[in-house]
Amino acid sequence: MAQHKLVIAEKPSVAQNLAAVIGATVRKDGYLEGNGWRVSWCVGHLAGLADADSYDPKYAKWRYDDLPILPEHWQMVVGKDKKKQFDILKKLMNAPDVTEVVNACDAGREGELIFRSVYELADCQKPMKRLWISSMEDSAIREGFANLRPGADYDGLRDAALCRAKADWLVGINATRLF
């Protein structure tokens, strides 16, 4: 069985550019394949923090007496309109012939969170690498793939983005319902 490395970009257009440079030119359902690579994509945030009523059905109705809403254990959920692409990514990540997963989402906090949310919800245990590029020029892409870093080097960015998301959620849910 041939071995593959899976690359996940933030959006289809970026995935197509990356795939062209690394030789993954065969179109499949939700990804491209070739030259030992599979390249797929998120469509922005495929997953996000669960709505308040996911934590307790009583939060479906807005009541002042229920404030503040402070989840003890945060839940990430896949958006209903994004389930198909998530399922494709989950299947690809956990395929037995995939040896590692490369996060090629945008270089920054949100790109890190977009990828990590999918990686974690898919319960992927494969080694994770990070493609960090600031240009879509072919030479920059080749250089980026030649210098992949361990995904764990970017844990701080994921943590920062997740803290921002939780803070937005807390302020948004509680302040909106308060006023």
Residue ranges: model-predicted function:
Residues M1-F179:
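Intrinsically disordered, low-complexity regulatory segments
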